[in-house]
Amino acid sequence: MLYPPGAPARIPLAAITGTNGKTTTSRMLAHILKSSGHVVGMTSTGGVQIDGRITVKGDMTGPQSAQIVLRDPTIDFAVLETARGGILRSGLGYSECDVAACINVTSDHMGLGGIDTLEQLAKVKETVVRIANDTVVLNADDKLCLKMADNCRAKHLCYITMDATHGLVREHIRANGRAVVLEKGINGDMITIYDNGAHIPLLWSHLIPATIEGKAMHNVQNAMFAAAMAFSFNTDLDAIRMGLRTFDTSFFQSPGRTNVYNEHPFKVILDYAHNQASFRAMADLADRL
């Protein structure tokens, strides 16, 4: 029988929104999942990818792009970057997801589509968070992201913080909640997962090539989001570690995102940065290089 009763009709779906970091986090998560044996369909500002191969080029972060991926019969996992513009124009392109993340909410595209304040922008991005069934991953260092926790229907809430002393996150951990925390250690900064009372040291941040020896703090945060989402899909811990340790910022693996060139007497950083927060991230990286 081609479609026996009770046969699964859906695949796991991860949705990623926010102002900055969506594309890199999507690429990181897709790489982790592919490394662990999945055939991943992904949408991002770089195009539609099926199993690591670009099938449609361009900014593909809207509902039509999501439908391209979800209609593909060869994939067993979907990672969908979901941007503000597509939501305002035509919605999401999917009715629910398993795991959703909002990385941050900062000023970008203001004055377009009737969005004039950060609070209005946050409400648009919250659309993704509201439809997650299993886990919502939120930036605890961003007040607008934190407010989204009040409107989650998901079974689990996972906080991401770069501040190991964050009071709310520590309280969440004590209540057996899930969190990914950047903690200082003798060898550097350790990305640590807390879940249901367990304390799991995952990986030193400087061992992730995309962080450029731990200097690209924005990519440390992106890696924490990717790890949290992969963990929420019950991905093997060693597969998460291996995925992050084999993801770099070369033009071939992450075009247009923190590509550093050393072929000249000076360093060149190629990045898609186009708003104040992303410019600050690039300036911070330049100071650390």
What do these predicted regions represent?
Residues 1-15, 24-37, 245, 252:
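Short, basic phosphate-binding NTP loop
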Residues 22-25, 222:
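Conserved lysine of the Walker
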Residues 36-51:
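Short beta-strand-centered segment that lines the nucleotide-binding/catalytic pocket of NTP-utilizing
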Residues 115-122, 153-280:
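Adenine nucleotide phosphate-binding catalytic loops in nucleotide-utilizing enzymes
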Residues 29, 33, 69, 223-233, ...:
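Buried hydrophobic packing segments
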Residues 54-160, 164-172, 207, 276, ...:
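Flexible active-site lid/hinge loop adjacent to a nucleotide/diphosphate
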Residues 8, 285-289:
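Glycine-rich phosphate/diphosphate-binding loops that line cofactor/substrate pockets in enzymes
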